Each structure stands twice: as C-alpha cells, then as structure tokens.
Amino acid sequence: MNKPEIMTQTDIAGPAPRHQTTKVMVGNVAVGGGAPIVVQSMTNTDTADVESTVAQVAALARAGSEMVRITVDREEAAAAVPHIREQLDKRGITTPLIGDFHYIGHKLLTDYPACAEALAKYRINPGNVGFKDKRDTQFSTIIELANKYGKPVRIGANWGSLDQELLSKLMDENAASATPRDARAVTREAMVQSALLSAARAQELGMPKDRIILSAKVSAVQDLIAVYQDLAARSDYAIHLGLTEAGMGSKGIVASSAALGILLQQGIGDTIRISLTPEPGGDRTLEVQVAQELLQTMGFRTFVPLVAACPGCGRTTSTTFQELARSIQDFIREEMPAWKSKYPGVENLNVAVMGCIVNGPGESKHANIGISLPGTGEAPAAPVFVDGKKFRTLRGPTIAADFKALVIDYIDQRYGSGAKAPESVTAAE
C-alpha cells in the first residue's frame, strides 16, 4: 500500500515575491520599487495649533513613523504648515509631512505656496476633490502645483466618499448587463477605476509615474483584500495599504492586521498605516507600534528586539512572570530611540521570558538571551541562557532586576562599539 504524500513546510516558506511597483521618493523616504515597506501615521491635532502638532509629529516620529500625514483643511492650517516644518527641522526631525486635502486643496495650495513647498507629498481624494464641472479643473490644479513643486501625490479613493458619478455609471451598466454582478462587486470596481482613472489623468497632465502612489480604502476586510488585489493586478503604481474606519482597541488592531497581513503575504503593499480610533486620552503612537509589530511578526522588517513570552497557565507564578515580561518589553521600546545609533543591529536581538520548565529552557535556548522562571511549586531558581548555552542561574527576590541587568550587559557587549563575539560574553556560573 502506497503511503499518502504529506505536504510539509520547507525552508523556503515565506511571503510571495513583492509586487513590482514604481519607486516614489517622498522627501528622503523611498516607497515602492522594492524598498522596505514604510510605516506611516496621521496626527489628530488641529494643524493650525503649531505647538500641539509639532509635539505629536515628534512623538510619532520617535515611535518609528517614517512619514506623518497632517490635515490641511482650511487657511489657518495651510498657514501653519511651514512653521510646523521649521520647528521639526530645528529639533532634528526630518520625517516627511504629507498634506491631507479634501474639497479645497486646490485653493489652499495656490494661496499658500509656503505650505505647498513645505509638504513632502499631497494626498488627494478623487471622490471629493471637486464636484460636477469643477472636479476635473480642481484636480488638474493640484496636479499642476505638484508638478511645479516637484511633489509626489497619493491618489486615495475611499469607500465613504466614492465618486458618485462614476459609481452611478457603473451601476447602470451593470443593471443592463446580461450577467449582472452584486452591488458590492460594482462598488469595488468603482473604487479601483476611480484610483486608476485619476492616476492616468495625472500622467496626462505631466505627472510622472514615479511621483504617484495609489490607495483604495474600505472598512470591510474582505472587500479591502479584493480591491487591493485588483488594483495591484491592473497597475504597477506604488501602493499604500490601510483599512479605513477600523475602529478602536482590539477590534481595530485585529481587523487591520487581518486585512493587511493577507495582502502583505501576497506581496502587495509598499507603505502601510494602521488606522486606529484612539481611546479617550490614549496614546496616538499605538498605531505606529502596531504597524511595526505587524511587519516584524511577518518577517518583513525588524524595528525592535523581539521579546518572546509564553501565555502563562496554571504552572506559572503569574505575577513574577508577567511583571518581568512587561518590564523587559517596555524597557526595550523606551530605549530604542537611543539604541538605534548606539547599538547598530540591536533590533535583531531576540529575548525570551518563559514561565516554567516545560517549554522554558527550550525556548530560551533559541533566543539570544532567555530566562526560564520557576513555575508554581518549582524551586525558586531561574536558569538564564545566552546564545543557546546555560549562562547562570538566578535566585532570590531580585530575579527580575538581575535579568534586566544581564540583558543590558549582553546588548552592550554584543552590539556596542567594543562588541565581542557571542561566545565571549562574560562568565557563566
């Protein structure tokens, strides 16, 4: 009897090859063309409030946002943009600013040339750039100004503000078809066409392909996946991914991660934003952290050292285990802005914080440095492993502080200016 063939993962398992797109330079950041997938974010301050906006852009940049979008919705906001750019430059923050325009972008960019110059990219929504006879004229004005100042644009269609004239046309054509599609499929087609037709018009006006980025955002995960698959199949423009109106808390994180994770695995996407509704008084930088963690978890980029920790169960002394895992995670994220320049390569560090002897020693050996805490009923001793080898055993009430000190020492010796080879990190017990 023949044995059935068993399908297994191989050492070549991974995402599909990246969809080949045209590289676009947004300030000093490359988007598309095989460049690393870029993390971006958006402020929620009143852009006219220069001080608050500068503070939030700075916080987002420190958290790791590589581009930051700001709303430019009225004259006071447009007038503030060059001052925001100036204040950021004085702080040494070179993160490109993207102007988000709706309805009157053509007028603001015309009337405030310093704003047009200070921004690194203009975001245009083809669904509300203008209405009826004014739409083409106002869209053309923005493209001509982008050409004048040498700025790229993102043409971003959105489910909630879709070009109704185009949608009505496609709905009528669908109704007359012998094999009509459902309304959602027609709406998805309108999204794709809105972006592609606008991009084609921009090129007719002299905008080169290497200054055009496209997006087509919806709030339903399956629709978003279908829209972006279609958009990628029909063009080679650089692509911005994002799930609009994802929501707050775990719902928003899960929805965005599910949608973007599938598309990224298929090789689609050159820059991403995780659009989260912040909790009242919440930290705006959470969206940056989630975007980084998504890319790092999937193996596309590394931003911070990875802390692996078991979920905990009845075998673990939960308080000690949880406190140490949280302490190490928070410490690493807080220190990363300084570590980036002081310890090149530290983002590749793997740390393991395990809760008991079942999987703890094995997982700790796979990390650069790991600890297996004593579980419930076990001896109060925690073996530490460095680069796969038993290093020493920590005991007593200061296990957490002692392990943190060992992590700091390991980072300094492994990634500091006088870095030693892994096996020379000092003195096992």
UniProtKB/Swiss-Prot annotation:
Keyword Iron annotated: yes
Record pathway: Isoprenoid biosynthesis; isopentenyl diphosphate biosynthesis via DXP pathway; isopentenyl diphosphate from 1-deoxy-D-xylulose 5-phosphate: step 5/6
Pfam families listed in its UniProt record: GcpE
Keywords, sorted A to Z: 4Fe-4S, Iron, Iron-sulfur, Isoprene biosynthesis, Metal-binding, Oxidoreductase
Cofactor(s) listed in the protein's UniProt record: [4Fe-4S] cluster
Top EC class for this record: oxidoreductase
GO molecular function terms noted in the UniProt entry: 4 iron, 4 sulfur cluster binding; 4-hydroxy-3-methylbut-2-en-1-yl diphosphate synthase activity (ferredoxin); 4-hydroxy-3-methylbut-2-enyl-diphosphate synthase activity (flavodoxin); iron ion binding
GO biological process: isopentenyl diphosphate biosynthetic process, methylerythritol 4-phosphate pathway; terpenoid biosynthetic process
EC numbers on record: 1.17.7.3
UniProt: [4Fe-4S] cluster binding residues: C310, C313, C356, E363
Record's cofactor remark: Binds 1 [4Fe-4S] cluster.
Catalytic function, reaction form: (2E)-4-hydroxy-3-methylbut-2-enyl diphosphate + oxidized [flavodoxin] + H2O + 2 H(+) = 2-C-methyl-D-erythritol 2,4-cyclic diphosphate + reduced [flavodoxin]
Keyword Iron: yes
Family, per entry: Belongs to the IspG family.
Function noted in UniProt: Converts 2C-methyl-D-erythritol 2,4-cyclodiphosphate (ME-2,4cPP) into 1-hydroxy-2-methyl-2-(E)-butenyl 4-diphosphate.
PANTHER family, per the entry: 4-HYDROXY-3-METHYLBUT-2-EN-1-YL DIPHOSPHATE SYNTHASE (PTHR30454), 4-HYDROXY-3-METHYLBUT-2-EN-1-YL DIPHOSPHATE SYNTHASE (FERREDOXIN), CHLOROPLASTIC (PTHR30454:SF0)
Entry protein name: 4-hydroxy-3-methylbut-2-en-1-yl diphosphate synthase (flavodoxin)
Source species: Bradyrhizobium sp. (strain BTAi1 / ATCC BAA-1182)
